[in-house]
Amino acid sequence: MNYGEIKKTDIANGIGVRVTLFVSGCTRHCKNCFNAETWDFNYGKPFTKETEDEVLAALAPGFINGLTLLGGEPMEPQNQRALVPFLHRVRKLYPEKDIWCYSGSTLETDMLKDGGRNRCEVTDEFLSLLDVLVDGAFVDELKDISLRFRGSSNPVSYTHL
């Protein structure tokens, strides 16, 4: 898996101050996506053990509320497979921090349903490691900049999956 960016103090993508990881790779290609450069699975840098350690160190300060995953698309199966071991490390080291994930996919159709576009052998485990999932593709016609933690009115937030 590659990643496009790590923000070590982000206040736009979840409650409180967060560390944000933008993964690479997305097959959705939403119209007017704010991060279209991350559609390419080869964009950015490889997500290595050293990268994991960098993110884990950034999570250490007490003022950091948690980790947010976005992209690209964290729920692309190859990204899920790469992220599950890392998320276990986050949970072990920082059980008090929460984990948010933004996905253009939908929980019920794409992640939980057999044959869903993002369902794979690690999806249930991946979801169990999240505290908040914000699902639903960005829809330009539903764009609403007044919404908190969403770019359009269609995404749904799920907590404690």
Regions inferred by a protein language model and the residue ranges of each:
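C-terminal substrate-binding/active-site "lid" region of AdoMet-derived donor-dependent transferases
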Residues: I145, F149-R150
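Structural recognition of alpha->loop->beta junctions
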Residues: D114-L142
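Hydrophobic pocket-lining residues within nucleotide cofactor-binding pockets
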Residues: C26, P74, F138
